[in-house]
Amino acid sequence: SSEASGAQPAETEPAVSEAPSVDDSTPYGQHGTLHVENGKLTDADGNIVQLYGMSTHGIAWFPQYINYDSFRTLRDDWNTNCIRLAMYTAEYGGYCADGDKEQLKQLVRDGVSYATELGMYVIVDWHILSDCDPNQNKDEAIAFFREMSEAFADNDNVLYEICNEPNSGTSWDSIKSYAEEVIPVIREQKPDAVILVGTPTWSQEIDKAAASPLTFDNVMYTLHFYAGTHKDDLRNRLETCAQNNLPVFVSEFGMCDASGNGANDFDSTTKWLDLLNKYQISFCCW
């Protein structure tokens, strides 16, 4: 055995900092490090890449789904290439509320490790919601993203989502000032990582970001929709922004209404997905 020969045993838990799988059959193996070019997510060869996958629910509430087999099923049986790790900040069990910070960070590290082993892309999502303005927990966010970007310094498959859904009147100027403090912290360790920035009104007002974009490279702006509620008006807003080469990432969507209730609206969902595919916009389903 390897142990008998004095080498390290092969069956050790993969270190989070190891480079992603470069097996050509995996999503990361095919595309490698991503960047943003002319409003599109692209790979090292300049090919447009569309990420598509699932978001977890709050990892504090459903940690059991952060496992290798779940992610492998999503990759192989559901044909996805991306997983979003949703870590609530202010809700019950949230990182900035009464949550166990070390346990939550370990869940994020585990999730990144499994995605890395599978050659999938993975989004670390600072999931603000009832903390409507990301500046409310800005110091915590800065410390978290500093630690995570150091932990994942060798993981080019990681994207960083710095504020899920600003809401309740939080302005783009407020979000922008927050991003201008948080992004440089990530850039210290990951100068080229793709960073996703939420937009006002539960990440619907991408037009506000288009009117006053951030100056950093490799930044995308998030649009969230729930197909039963959000229809032509929001689709038209997205199409206008996409035509003007705004880098947009749909980091969360659902087929029901925005409250999470109601039947799935397949007609509206189909229109949305057709639009996302037309402009090769990445998406994660909630």
List PLM regions with ranges.
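Short, histidine-centered active-site or binding-site loop motifs used for metal coordination
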Residues: 55, 89, 126-130, 164-166, ...
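A short acidic, helix-capping loop that chelates divalent metal ions and anchors anionic groups
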Residues: 91-95, 131-133, 168-170, 257-259
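Gram-positive cell-envelope targeting signals
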Residues: 1-17
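N-terminal carbohydrate-binding accessory modules
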Residues: 14-82, 98
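Aromatic-lined substrate-binding rim segments of carbohydrate-active enzymes
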Residues: 67-131, 138-143, 147, 185-189, ...
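Extracellular glycoside hydrolase catalytic/binding regions
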Residues: 33-34, 58, 63, 121, ...
